[in-house]
Amino acid sequence: MESRDSKIYPGIRRLENDITRRRDAHGNRIAAAQSEQSVAAPYTRTVWVYVPAQYVKGTPAPLLVVQDGHGYLNLVLRVIDNLIAAGRVPVQVAVLIDSGGGDAQGSQRGLEYDTLSGRYSDFVESEVLLRIKQECDIVFTDDPEGRATMGASSGAACAFTLAWYHSERYRRVLCYSGTFVNQQSPPDPMTPRGAWEYHAHLIQEAARKPLRIWLEVGEKDLHHDDPEETWHNWPLANRRMANALKVKGYAYRFTLSLGARHVDPRVAEQTLPGALEWVWRGYLSTVEA
């Protein structure tokens, strides 16, 4: 997919200048206005579509949207294949989407994944899924209970954001090493600490949404020694997310992986089958009923 064809994300890249090189005392980037840290730039985005052999053409398919798709092709597709064959998850189509490139503040990936809004969900719905429907002749279910989303790092925060801002589209979320920290770019005065705001007050203050959420973080994940006031400690942020979800009465699971680091591949290899099975729990029985 070419950026020139997108009405929602025409493309940016981070500038390398004194502003974007700024760091706080703990080495974290400091966000700035988009005009100071980014410049318009084209990108090419790759999207993979996995259609299982069991899919019956023309029937509305349950959907799994995966952020940073290239990083999960082998693992996710192998796991889904095995789970479908065993009848442990619904027959589903997986859409694995690469970001528009770069990372963190000022980048296209940062704009897509770390922004707290419904913008990325609108992009997936109106530009990615619509094109797949047209070009691959696939019908996706409109039932939000039949739509899941997953990712790691900023892709995990993005997966949660997809469901949080559009729970009428997605109800099932799977997150590895979620970037629920102060990394939003450009800054937004409505959510000044970025995804840290989810566990600081957004989850507590909003009416409970019909979401099912699986969270994981490594014990030695990014900035695990940083103090809370940096709003940039991954293990702390994810523990706070789990507590906020618990207090509010959400269906959730939280895994703290001992000794593991950021997006530790050993953790995903060991936990993804059970995580996907738990995320989809209840959907098969509902459909069969």
State each model region's role.
Residues 1-289:
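Non-catalytic cap/lid and distal C-terminal segments of serine-dependent acyl enzymes
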